[in-house]
Amino acid sequence: MNIDDYIEKLEIQKEGFFYKCPYCNYTNADVKAIKKHIKSKHYDIIAKEVENLNKQNKPQRKPMKKQPKKKDDDYKDYMLLFAHKKKCKIYLDNGMIVEGTVKAKDRFNIMVLDAKVDDKEVERIIIQKGHIVALIPLEE
């Protein structure tokens, strides 16, 4: 809640024909003038009250449950189960064709050793799994 909302929700007492400031003896026939007075003269008090209200209304965070650590084997996805340490041909989304021995690097990347990339020999190349369109094993 901000200060303007708090002032709007304040219950301002009417005494006869006049409204009275809840923080001092100031009176006026116009309720808007009283609210303007409260904001200008009693801003510090209002700010503290709003701050206390905001502290009370904050939702308490629940502690997160600790998840068990996953083993390295859990990170190997289906694609690498049959291609790990085998010679494969990999088609990438940018049109490149990579051929070589596939090794699991981590859950997002694979490493291809002794690779041939578009008929160029490369010692090793790391490929993000998201860019792989097709992976074809060349040996059983």
UniProtKB/Swiss-Prot annotation:
One of its GO terms (molecular function) is zinc ion binding. A zinc finger (C2H2-type) spans 21-42. Keywords: Metal-binding, Plasmid, Zinc, Zinc-finger. Gene3D superfamilies: 2.30.30.100. To M.jannaschii MJECL27. This is Uncharacterized protein MJECS06.
